[in-house]
Amino acid sequence: MSTVSSPAPDGARVSVRKCEHWAHGACCAEIFDKEHDGKQYCVLHYPGPEKSKDFKTALERKLSAQDFDFEGTWFPEKLSFQEFKFTGKANFSSARFREVVNFREAEFSAGADFREAKFSTGADFREAKFSADADFREAKFSAGANFAGAQFGSATYFAMAHFDANANFRGTQFRAATSFFGTSFRADAVFNYAQFEAPATFNVARFSKSALFTGAVFNATVYFRKARFKDEDPHRNDDITADNNTIDSKTLRPEGRTIPVDFVEARFKDGLAFTGTKFANRVFMSFASASFEKPERAVFHSTSLRPHWFADIDPRAFSFINVAWGDLLQWGAVRKEIEQLKTTKKSNANQLLEITFRQLAVNAEENNRFEEATNFRYMAMDVKRLQRRRIDPFRLSWWYWLLSGYGERVPRAFLALLSILVLFALAYWVGDAAWWQPKQSRDLASATTSEQKFVSQRLALRESLVYSAGVMALQKPEPLPANKRAKTLVLWETILGPVQAALLALAIRRKFMR
């Protein structure tokens, strides 16, 4: 502690000591108050509620002197700066607010510094105006933080800040570059109808609950590189990462409360970037009715996505690089996508998803991701099938799906062709000798009589397989069918075999012609 002289009320000189534990500027001319844990503090920095009366006097004295340096100050009780005008730079860095603090409609004309400030109970900055830089780096909000309707006219920094309760930025205006780099949102983060006039970064930010950007306007690029949308519970491991080439059934069956990442009706006038972003299994991201003036600047790089997240928008011009869509070949994947979308859209979910799959297929096709395009086309047609009865043998499209996966599934078409061959071969094998005409020798040199008698025989299993293959190849293998049953089987295989072979050829052609 340093010592200065100050006049006492009776004119005598008394010893006044300045607090050196915190910044000198904030406690200049403040007398020594008390000791705490062996350290000496002035009335501003003493960390105890019993100083309230003296603190109020010191606070009023600083404000009346237009002294807004409160670096490291410990505020013991509720405080209101509502509609207060800070004509000079307001320095609240490292300050501690024990009770609710109210900055509603306050005006910060020369900058606001809240670096490493701690708000223990609640912070109200509704409709506050920041004309110069606003710095909340590493600030900690233990209770609700309300910035609804606030206006940030210059650079704004919330980098590495911690919001342990709801963070409300509804309708907030960010007119210059804004940084939420590494910011932690452990409760709902609400940016509904916020306006970002300059680039905004949420790189490495962590969203544990809802991230809502409904109706937000982005006039410049917004970045979400390596952001995490997941519950930070250390006992939960529910990431979907771009390193995963497949997503198991548990991934597509969320447990617990869904984590919404909501860009509904948002407007992106420049770009959007999700790079290396991690999403929890329970995340549901929606861009429904969002508008992109430069859709080619919407970039999703090395991250994991779900097709139903892009329902009700047009993603054909988006840039998808090294994106993991999950196992689109998994049985029931389409049905799970429909169920996920129906959790938020009760009506026309099937129609929206069908359109989305077709648009994603176009995007993949135009960017030479042909295997991915094949999967999306298949899923688009399968959505329409699932709207009807599951088994519908009277509809041609149902057979098209069953026998070749709409001409997109080579293994299925091959398996169907093989099944036709084997099933007809088994039918020929179980048939008795009366099914077949006797073989007649045409080797005239070997004939010793003018008439020779032959006996019909059943086909062995190997002979049946060869016979079935010959019929399928439109040959006329011997023995020829002798009764109606055998002739009917041969006729049906003559039709079905070549048709299925054509479906297989079509699927192969679609796979390689691109």
Predicted regions and their residues:
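C-terminal substrate/ligand-recognition segments
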Residues: 416, 420, 491-507, 512
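N-terminal leader/targeting and pre-domain segments
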Residues: 1-396
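Membrane-water interface at transmembrane helix exits
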Residues: 424, 428, 432, 436, ...
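Alpha-helical transmembrane segments and their helix-start/interface "positive-inside/aromatic belt" motifs
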Residues: 408-418
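Pore-loop/selectivity-filter region of tetrameric P-loop cation channels
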Residues: 398-410, 433-499, 503
